[in-house]
A protein has these predicted regions:
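A charged, aromatic-enriched C-terminal amphipathic alpha-helix characteristic of glycosyltransferases
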Residues: 324-362
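Membrane-proximal helix-turn-helix segments that form the acceptor-binding/catalytic region
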Residues: 89-90, 118-137
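Donor nucleotide-sugar binding/catalytic pocket of nucleotide-sugar-dependent glycosyltransferases
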Residues: 132-170
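Active-site proximal beta-strand in glycosyltransferases
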Residues: 70, 91-110
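Conserved catalytic-core segment of nucleotide-activated headgroup transferases in glycan assembly
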Residues: 17-36, 161-255, 259
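Nucleotide-sugar-dependent
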Residues: 194-202, 250-287, 293-304
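N-terminal pre-catalytic "stem/leader" segment of glycosyltransferase-like enzymes
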Residues: 1-78, 306
Length: 366
C-alpha cells in the first residue's frame, strides 16, 4: 500500500454494499464469498466492518448513510446506468459514498462463439457509460485494468482467490494413485465453445479439432470428465464421457474434488478476450489436487506446463498420464506459484481486499 495514503481514523466503521450483477459466477467468487469473510475480519478492536449484498436497488438515500462504498458488480444496461444517475444525483449530495464498479470479465469485443456476445454488444455503450460515472473500478487482472483505463482513470486490481472454508484442504491425487485409469477433467461454461442452439451459424471456441479428436479416440484409455458443459463435437461419444451438469457454485468445489482428477486441462484461444481472464482455473486445479495443463496465454504465465498447440497439449496429457512423478512435480510447482494467492483466508488477502478499496480514495488501514 502506498506510504502516502492516509490511515483511516480510529475507531472506524467500514460498510461495504454491493449490487450484484450475477449470483453464480464472479458475483459469488468476488463479492458474496469475500463479503462473508469481511464480517469476520478483525485486525484491531477499533475497526468494525459490515457488508451486505443486494439484487434490487434501494432508492431511499438515507439507506446509504452507514456505508463506506457502494459497489455495482457487472452493470451493463440502460437500466443500470439510470441507477448510477440516481445514486450520483440523490445519494452522493447527502452522503459521501463513492460508486465502485466491480468487474471480472471483458465485456467489450467478446468473441462470436461466446453466446454472451449478443447481449453485451447491444449494451456496450451502456457499459462504458456506467464505468465513466464510477468513482473507481476494481478489476481482477492488470490486463483488464489496462483495457478499461479508457473509461475510468481510477482503477485498482484485486486478484481472484478461493474460499478455503468451502474448498477445504488439498488432497493431491498423486498421493494416493491406485493404478486405475487416469482421470482427466475439464470444467467451465458453454461460453468456451459455439453451440448451434445458442450461436447458430457460428463455429469455433477454445477446443481445437485435434484436441477434440484426441478426446474422442481416448475415451477407453482415460476417464474423461466434463463439468458444466461439453462441446457438441463430443456428443457422438457422450456415453463414454462422464458429464456433470452445471453445479451451484457453493456445491461445485465438492463436486469436482469428489472426482479426484489426476490431470485437469484449460485450453484457451490466444485472443484479447482470453488475455483479460484471471488464473481462476489454475487456482481451482490446485485446490482439487490435480496437475494442470494450460494454453500458453497471459492468465497462465506462471504455470509449469503451457502449450501453444493442440499437439503440444496432447503430448503433455500423454506424458503426465504415464508418469505419476511428473504429475507430482507439476502440481507442486503450480501450488508454489499460486500459494499466496490461493485462499482468501491466508496471506492477508482479506486485508488487502479492504486496503485496495480504501486505496482507490487514498486511504488505508492503520
Amino acid at each position: 500500500m502506498n506510504k502516502h495514503y492516509k490511515s483511516i481514523k480510529l475507531p472506524a466503521r467500514l460498510g461495504f454494499l454491493s449490487y450484484l450483477g450475477d449470483v453464480q459466477g464472479c458475483g459469488t467468487i468476488r463479492v458474496i464469498q469475500p463479503f462473508l469473510l469481511l464480517n469476520h475480519y478483525r485486525s484491531t478492536k477499533n475497526v468494525q466492518i459490515i457488508s451486505q449484498t443486494l439484487s434490487h436497488y434501494i432508492f431511499e438515500p438515507e439507506y446509504y448513510k452507514n456505508f463506506t462504498f457502494c459497489q455495482f458488480q457487472r452493470s451493463a444496461t440502460e437500466h443500470h446506468f439510470k441507477l448510477f444517475l440516481h445514486f450520483k444525483s440523490q445519494v452522493q449530495p447527502k452522503f459521501n459514498v463513492p460508486i465502485v464498479y466491480e468487474i471480472d470479465d471483458m465485456l467489450i469485443g467478446i468473441p462470436d462463439y461466446n453466446y454472451a456476445t449478443q447481449y453485451y454488444t447491444k449494451n456496450e455503450e451502456w457499459v462504458k457509460k456506467c464505468m465513466g460515472l464510477s468513482d473507481g473500478m476494481i478489476t481482477s487482472t492488470p490486463q483488464l485494468k489496462k483495457v478499461y483505463a479508457e473509461y475510468c482513470n481510477n482503477i485498482s486490481v484485486i486478484p481472484n482467490h478461493l474460499p478455503k472454508f468451502i474448498w477445504g484442504d488439498i488432497y493431491p491425487a498423486h498421493d494416493y494413485y491406485d493404478g486405475e485409469k487416469i482421470k482427466i477433467l475439464w470444467s467451465g461454461s458453454q461460453n468456451h465453445f459455439a453451440h448451434s442452439q445458442l450461436t447458430p451459424g457460428v463455429h469455433g471456441g477454445d477446443f481445437g479439432n485435434k484436441l477434440l479428436n484426441f478426446i474422442t479416440k481416448t475415451t477407453d484409455k482415460y476417464d474423461w470428465y466434463f463439468v458444466g458443459s461439453m462441446p457438441n463435437e463430443l456428443m457422438p461419444v457422450k456415453d463414454k464421457i462422464c458429464f456433470l451438469p452445471w453445479q451451484n457454485i457453493f456445491e461445485y468445489p465438492m463436486a469436482v474434488k469428489a472426482i479426484e482428477p489426476d490431470i485437469a486441462i484449460a485450453p484457451l484461444m490466444d485472443n484479447p478476450f482470453n488475455a483479460c481472464k484471471s488464473n481462476i482455473k489454475m487456482l481451482e486445479f490446485t485446490a482439487m489436487g490435480a496437475a494442470g495443463i494450460y494454453s500458453n496465454v497471459l492468465p497462465y504465465y506462471a504455470a509449469k506446463i503451457k502449450t501453444n498447440t493442440d499437439e503440444e497439449m496432447i503430448s503433455e496429457i500423454e506424458r503426465l498420464a504415464d508418469d505419476v512423478d511428473a504429475r507430482r512435480k507439476t502440481f507442486q510447482r503450480d501450488y508454489s506459484s499460486v500459494r499466496s494467492q490461493l485462499w482468501w483466508e491466508e496471506a492477508n488477502n482479506v486485508k488487502n481486499y479492504i486496503n485496495t478499496y480504501l486505496g482507490l480514495f487514498r486511504q488505508r488501514l492503520p
